[in-house]
């Protein structure tokens, strides 16, 4: 039988109810300041979150204007159309003893019995956010460094972000892949600031499904179109 991290917490349910708890996943690398950030915040039940960026994967959340977490977004329910509203869970949580005892552990036990142990602990939090009285808030990061390492590529990126001696050389080795570092500004990259124009981008987006799904035009059609665009007479020889 396969198990997931919900089972790990289920095994620790008695200890969870004895005191306030910091829950940290083991595949993270992050600045020490994140500990101070979450511990010094007076709110008792917090999840560190980061505004969505293209490299992020896994569980997302939505926040209201008071930073209450109002929904957990799984991979199955993720929609690219809604990414402006998404925050990624950093997977560092602070839970009070009362929250664990009165809310999380009871739902954890019920969820595990109903759906089994091959689930994620965030699913329990998602159920709790559906209650009228939400006790869990998101605490957005403000530029602090962190990364989730799931494979060798993630490890290489994380080593680049946190490098102390040879960071420039590591970045330069990734030339052509700077888009994986959304906050990086490359002032040496030769680009045409006027291309592509906004209207062209909008036209490509509007026709993306056709461009992706249909066969490309053959040489005959492409030659005809190019001749038309450049006002050239097409030779019939």
Located regions from the model:
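Conserved alpha/beta core of the MobA/IspD/sugar-nucleotide pyrophosphorylase nucleotidyltransferase superfamily
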Residues: 86-173, 179-183
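Short, acidic Gly/Pro/Ser/Thr-rich loop/turn segments
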Residues: 55, 79, 100-102, 146, ...
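Conserved N-terminal alpha-helix of the aminotransferase class I/II PLP-enzyme fold
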Residues: 197-237
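Short beta-strand-to-loop acidic/aromatic patch adjacent to the donor-nucleotide binding site
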Residues: 19-29
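N-terminal "arm"/small-domain region of PLP-dependent enzymes with the aminotransferase-like
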Residues: 163-214
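Conserved core of the sugar-phosphate nucleotidyltransferase
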Residues: 31-115
